């Protein structure tokens, strides 16, 4: 820690003696000067925030711990109540799914009437089952007949659709061939224009072969046009 002295001219550091016996001169100190060893160290905001107390002033950690324990007990109590409520709801749903007069117990379903059923009481139930089986068989036969007719109609529709699709594909193929051949005719006509010009370039072998095939290409175009017109009708 630096020792300062003050005189009429201001603050100064008095002369000090070195280890070898020599003396340092007194040094005048400017107003507001802070020595390097007295400059406070820099601390980031995160470090300053970490040094602050986590609890508000006047609040003890014991009170905070008790409040946490109380909240935890309340949460567990609510969880138990929710579990019990779900179990009761499931029991009610299971009881509502049983027929009238039947009670849901742990061992299974028990009828409300404990009297022994008479042998004649089973006959109406058997009669009802046989009538239900007959109606089910008749309905299955009707569905089978309807299914067979529906399958036949669907098969005929698919066959006709396949024929139409095949015809459309054939027409599309003919149209593509016509476009290619007409393009070749345009190229041949361009070559012929070059031949008619006196100062035009000489033609190579491939170009001459194209010109020779012009009649064959025109004939093929006529045949395809007839075929395309017949398919469109």
UniProtKB/Swiss-Prot annotation:
Coiled coil stretches, renumbered: 62-97, 167-199
Subcellular location: Cytoplasm; Nucleus
Self-association state and partner proteins as the record states: Interacts (via N-terminus) with mago and tsu/Y14; the interaction is direct.
Family affiliation: Belongs to the pym family.
GO molecular function: RNA binding
Regions crossing the membrane: none
GO cellular component: cytoplasm; exon-exon junction complex
Entries under Pfam families matching the protein: Mago-bind
Chief location category: cytoplasm
Annotated protein name in UniProt: Partner of Y14 and mago
Biased composition (Low complexity): 122-142
Chain intervals with Basic and acidic residues compositional bias: 65-90
GO biological process, one term: exon-exon junction complex disassembly
Function: Regulator of the exon junction complex (EJC), a multiprotein complex that associates immediately upstream of the exon-exon junction on mRNAs and serves as a positional landmarks for the intron exon structure of genes and directs post-transcriptional processes in the cytoplasm such as mRNA export, nonsense-mediated mRNA decay (NMD) or translation.
Name of encoding gene: Pym
Sorted UniProt keywords: Coiled coil, Cytoplasm, Nucleus
Residue ranges of the region described as Disordered: 1-153
InterPro entries attached to this UniProt entry: PYM1, WIBG_mago-bd, WIBG_N_sf
């Amino acid at each position: 820690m630096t020792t300062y002295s003050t005189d009429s001219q201001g603050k100064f550091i008095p002369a000090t003696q070195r280890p070898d016996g020599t003396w340092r001169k007194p040094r005048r100190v400017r107003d507001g000067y802070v020595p390097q060893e007295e400059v406070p160290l820099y601390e980031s905001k995160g470090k300053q925030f970490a040094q602050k107390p986590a609890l508000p002033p006047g609040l003890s950690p014991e009170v905070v711990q008790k409040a946490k324990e109380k909240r935890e007990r309340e949460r567990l109590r609510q969880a138990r109540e929710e579990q019990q409520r779900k179990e009761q709801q499931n029991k009610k749903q299971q009881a509502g799914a049983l027929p009238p007069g039947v009670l849901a117990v742990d061992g299974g379903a028990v009828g409300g009437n404990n009297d022994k059923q008479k042998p004649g009481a089973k006959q109406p139930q058997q009669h009802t089952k046989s009538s239900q089986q007959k109606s089910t068989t008749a309905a299955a036969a009707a569905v089978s007949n309807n299914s067979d007719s529906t399958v036949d109609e669907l098969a005929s529709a698919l066959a006709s659709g396949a024929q139409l699709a095949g015809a459309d594909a054939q027409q599309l193929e003919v149209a593509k061939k016509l476009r290619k051949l007409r393009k070749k005719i345009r190229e041949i006509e361009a070559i012929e224009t070059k031949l008619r010009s006196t100062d035009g370039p000489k033609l190579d072998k491939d170009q001459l072969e194209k010109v020779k095939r012009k009649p064959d290409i025109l004939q093929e175009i006529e045949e395809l046009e007839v075929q395309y017109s017949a398919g469109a009708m």
